[in-house]
Amino acid sequence: MKKYVLFLFLLQIPMFAQWNTSAIKLGTFIPSSAGAGFMVGYEGGHFFDPQFSLGWSIDWFHANYTDAQVVNDLNGIPLDQIPGTTGSTNELRAKTNIHDFPIMALATVRFPVTPLSDVYINGGLGFEALFIDYSNYQNPSQNDFKTAFDFNWTLGVGGTYGFSKKAEVFAELGYHSSAPSWDYQVTDANGYKHTFQRTFDMSGMMLRAGVRFYY
C-alpha cells in the first residue's frame, strides 16, 4: 500500500510541472496622473506545484486628460513672456493622450480555500513604455509625440474559482507603481528657456477580473 501511495505521489510531480496558463484580464486602473481608465491585459504562467507559479504579463491602459502639473508649470511663467498665453491656452497645452504598456515578470503564491477556490498573493517587477501624444508648448494647435520609460513593480491579492478542469475565473485588487518622465523646454518672448520635467505618475490601484485557462 505504501509503495502504491508513493507511486501516485511521484506521478503527480511531473504533472504539476506541465501546467501552463494563459489569462485575459479586464478592469480599471487609477493612476495618479491620468485618473481612472480602462485596462486590458494578458498573462502567461507556469506552475511548479499547485500553490506556486511564475509568469509574465503585458497590459494596455489608455487615457485622455488635461495634465494639471503642466498647467501649473506654465502658469508660473508671466503671461506677457509667452505670446498668446492665457490660462485657457495653458490648458490646451496640457491636453494629453497616453497609451501605457507595463511589461512584468510575476510570482504568485496560492492558498486553497475549497477544492474549487483559492486566494492568492502576487508580485511583479518589470518596465513600462509610455507613449504620449500631447500639445506643442509653443503652438498648442499642433501635437507632439514622445515615448518615456521607467521600471515598475506591482503587488496584489485575489481569488479564483474553477468552473472546469482547465479553466477558472478570478478577480484581483493590486497596486502598481511607476513614474516615466522626460525634460522639456519652453522659450519665452525674451529668448529665455525654462526647463521643466514632465513626470507621469502611473502609480495607483488596479481592480480587474478575468478568465484563466490551463494546458
Predicted regions and their residues:
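Sec-dependent N-terminal signal peptides
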Residues: Y4-I13
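Boundary at the C-terminal end of the N-terminal hydrophobic targeting segment
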Residues: M15-W19
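Transmembrane beta-strand segments that form the barrel wall of outer-membrane beta-barrel proteins
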Residues: N20-V40
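Extracellular loop and loop/strand-boundary signature of outer-membrane beta-barrel proteins
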Residues: G27-I30, T89-K95, Q138-F145, K193-R198
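Residues that define the transmembrane beta-barrel architecture of outer-membrane proteins
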Residues: A34-V40, N97-I103, S117, N143, ...
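Outer-membrane beta-barrel translocator domains and adjoining extracellular loop/strand segments
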Residues: G35-V40, T66-D73, F131-S141, W182-N190
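Gram-negative (and chloroplast) outer-membrane scaffold detector with strong preference
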Residues: G45-Q138, Y161-K166, M202-Y215
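Predominantly the C-terminal beta-signal and adjacent terminal strand-loop region
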Residues: T66-D67, L155, F163-Y215
